[in-house]
Each structure stands twice: as structure tokens, then as C-alpha cells.
Amino acid sequence: MARAKRVKRDSVTHIYQTCKQAGTCPPDVLNKVEQTTVADNILKYGSGGVFFGGLGIGTGRGTGGVTGYRPLPEGPGIRVGGTPTVVRPSLVPESVGPADILPIDTIDPVEPTASSVVPLTESSATDLLPGEVETIAEINPVSEGPTIDSPVVTTSRGSSAILEVAPDPIPPTRVRVARTQYHNPAFQIITESTPAQGETSLADHILVTSGSGGQTIGSDITDIIELQEIPSRYSFEIEEPTPPRQSSTPLQRTQTTGRRRGVSLTNRRLVQQVQVDNPLFIDKPSKLVRFSFDNPVFEEDITNIFEQDLETFEEPPDRDFLDIKKLSRPQYSTTPAGYVRVSRLGTRGTIRTRSGAQIGSQVHFYRDLSSIDSEDPIELQLLGQHSGDATIVQGTVESTFVDMDIAEDPLSESIEAHSDDLLLDEAVEDFSGSQLVIGNRRSTTSYTVPRFETTRSSSYYVQDTQGYYVAYPEHRNTAEIIYPTPDIPVVVIHTHDNSGDFYLHPSLRRRKRKRKYL
């Protein structure tokens, strides 16, 4: 019997944090974290009455090492538990001379009958300084500050005071508009002007051209200097078309000199070559091996392994995929003709041994899609701000001018001036979007159109209804039935009846009278 493996318990700290709130902590965990074990209680209560600090008890051997103990040098004593003394710098005493003694006048005691008003008398002040000091007052003009209007207080007898406060005047505001332009070498802006007479401002480039016309005053002798064309910084080079690419997303990979492991797919001696025309081979190759349901979430970009029962034989949807037990993931390559090829390596399980091993050949399934050719270069336009392609709309220019030839020209086919034909409406009615509705006898809707008698040309009032209604003349040829008068009862006689009987008309039958019984 195998012994169960012992599972180590979690740390004491983590157990205490999780079980403290629920109150399910084990006693050993609770005592160890809260320090309430027997050893903790002995140290806690024993240290309160016994102090072993001065005995030198420790975990060492007590021999003092090789050289033994050395007595510590004596030094100043240290008071334990006392308040530290703060040393402050001493103050340097300064000598102060005797101050001038001022004469003090004696004040008579104040009698109760004396007045409480103290008269002010002029007294000569005592000079404190030995000599007179000349004082020069310098007047500096003070800038005028904001004037503050004093409020007007209106007070009437028997009413409260009214304080009228005037609003502060608003100083005029000066607005200054400035334009700052910073040169950014990473951003190039194209500024062009419309070829018209005018002025262009706020332009980043100024083009000065001469020889645009005008009148020259003076001699016509000018010096011709041979100039060299400076290429524009906005010019670009058109690259030559690149050769056809070998893959849709080419990657730069280092070529390995070693021999590739495995069998090459194009080896016809070892691998059977089968070309597949079914488009399901690209994304759903499992449907070519066996019948299955479609799962839109699953992408078959992996190696598929198919397991078949030994006692059953299933015909695959495609005969080329018979006995396929393994189909690899897709591999993309190019053919010498320039086509993109999708390849999958399959393994057949044709022969099965008694041990269960399957033996079969390898098959290379491939499908050629298309070729990847270089596209024609597209002429690109410069990105920037320019006004050369702007559309100028002028209302006066868009007006229509009619040139009427007043003079008579016998050879011209124009309309005569001031002719009434100019007032005719040449609009052409277009019924391309109309619908012709012709009703039958059963579902016919009739509308009454009133007619107004007037001396002018006849006009009609047509009711506005939904859809299009076409009025057309309708003639019906109905046969007129002439009924015989007077109505004579008809006696029906069967000529083919040999019995000689007859049938009376129901109107000739005698009516039954209802009689009352007494």
C-alpha cells in the first residue's frame, strides 16, 4: 500500500490573516502570532522581576578569545534615563554708557473740585541733540493713480441715510495682434498664389519675376548672365518598377548552408504529386477527407489527424484523399511560372499490421492560386496648402448673356427680333418615371370632374389624387335584350316524350286557399 504524500501546511502568518476574520484559527497558530505561548508568558512575567543585564550571560564561551579580556578605559559617566542638556552659546556683554537724565516736573495732586479739562500750554521742547541738523525735503512727483469718486451721502431728517455709489469708469482696452512664425524643418508647406492681379500676404516664400511686361525707360542694353537651374526641394524621383515579388510579405532571412531535413515535397520518386482543384483545400481540407459539420470558429491552419475504424469503410468526399490519416499544415511557395502554390503533405494508412501500425505512402497535395506581379506606379500629389487649385465663384460672370442680332440677315436662320416665339415654353414633358394604371370593370374608381363654363378657352379642374391616372375613351357594345310583352305563360311540351303528358308553368297552377275550420 502506497503511503500518502504529506502536504505541507501554509505559513502561520498567511493562515492567521485568512482565518482571523472568520474566527476559525487553530490554537497553535493563534498563540504563536499573538505571542501567548508558554515560553512567551515565562519571558514576559519573568523579565518583570529579574534583570540579568549586568551578569554577562551570553551564548559565547566566555574565554575572551585568544588574548583574553581587556579592561575598558574609564570615561565620563552617563546618566541613564535623564533629560539631555542643551549647550547654548554664551552672550558677549556690551558696555552701555550713562544715558542723559531729563528733568522731571512735579505734578500737583488733583483735587476733587478741580475741572477735568486739561488746558494745553505751549512748552519749549528740550533739545536732545547737541547741534541743529539741517533737513532738506526733496519732493518727488507722484504718478496719478486711479481717481476714486467720493460717495454722495443723502440724509434727511427722520429717514435712513442713502449712499449713492458711482460705478468705476472702465478704462479703454488696447488690443494688439501679432503673428509669430516658427520654422519646422520636418514640416514643409507649399504656398502658391493664384495667377491674378492682386497682393499676396502672409506668404512663406516670395517669388520675384522680371520681364513680365511694362514699359522700360532708358537703354535696352542688358547683361545676359548664364544661370544654373536650382532643383526644387519638392521634386521627387520616380523609382523604377521592381521585379516580381516571390511572396506577399517578403522577409529577410539568412540562408542556411546546411541540408534541409526531411523529404522534399517536389521529389516525385518518394512523394506522390496530386493537384487539387477544389477550393475547400485552402481553408477547410477536412471536408475533403470525411463528411463533417462546419465550425466557423475553427481555423484549420494546423496538422489534422484522422482516425478511422477498422471494421468500417467510409468513402471520402474526394477520391484523391482516400485512406488519409494525417494532413499537415499549409505551406506557401512560388512556382517557376510565378504562381502562388498552397501545399499540404498527407500520409496514407493503406496497410495496417496486427500490431496496429499503419503503413502508407506520402502524398503532396497542392493548388496554384495566382501570380504576384508588380503594379504600375501611381502618380502621387504633393501634400500641402496651395491656392492654385481653388475655385473662384463670381456671381456677375455666371450670368447668361443673350446676343440678339437686330440687323436683318437673310442668310441666317435665327429668330426674328422681338418675335412672339421667344415667349413660347420649350419645356419637354418627361414621363420616364410614370406608371400607366388601367383598371377593370370590377375595380374601377370614378372621379367626378366639374366643368366650368367660361368665355375663354376651356379649362378643367382635376382632383389631386395619389399615383397616375390615365383617362382614355371606352366604348362597350352590349347586346340589347327585347322582352316580349305581354308576358304569356309558356307551356313546355316534350316532343321526345311518348307519354303525351305535359308540364304546366308554375304561374298556371291553382293557388291553394287557406280555409278556416269552424
From Swiss-Prot:
Cysteines joined through disulfide linkages = C19-C25
Motif window: Nuclear localization signal: 1-10, 510-517
One Gene Ontology cellular component annotation held by this UniProt entry: host cell
Q: Name one Pfam family in it.
A: Late_protein_L2
Recorded hits in InterPro entries, A to Z, give: Late_L2 (IPR000784)
Region Disordered, annotated ranges: 238-262
Alphabetic keyword roster = Capsid protein, Cytoplasmic inwards viral transport, Disulfide bond, DNA-binding, Host endosome, Host Golgi apparatus, Host nucleus, Host-virus interaction, Late protein, Microtubular inwards viral transport, Phosphoprotein, Viral penetration into host nucleus, Virion, Virus entry into host cell
Q: Which GO terms describe its molecular function?
A: DNA binding; structural molecule activity
Q: How is it modified after translation?
A: Highly phosphorylated.
- State where the protein is found: Virion; Host nucleus; Host early endosome; Host Golgi apparatus
| Stretches that traverse the bilayer | none
Outline the subunit composition.
Interacts with major capsid protein L1. Interacts with E2; this interaction inhibits E2 transcriptional activity but not the DNA replication function E2. Interacts with host GADD45GIP1. Interacts with host HSPA8; this interaction is required for L2 nuclear translocation. Interacts with host importins KPNB2 and KPNB3. Forms a complex with importin alpha2-beta1 heterodimers via interaction with the importin alpha2 adapter. Interacts with host DYNLT1; this interaction is essential for virus intracellular transport during entry.
Protein family per UniProt: Belongs to the papillomaviridae L2 protein family.
> HAMAP family under this entry?
PPV_L2
Its function, per the record, reads: Minor protein of the capsid that localizes along the inner surface of the virion, within the central cavities beneath the L1 pentamers. Plays a role in capsid stabilization through interaction with the major capsid protein L1. Once the virion enters the host cell, L2 escorts the genomic DNA into the nucleus by promoting escape from the endosomal compartments and traffic through the host Golgi network.
Q: What is this protein called?
A: Minor capsid protein L2
This chain's source organism reads Human papillomavirus 12
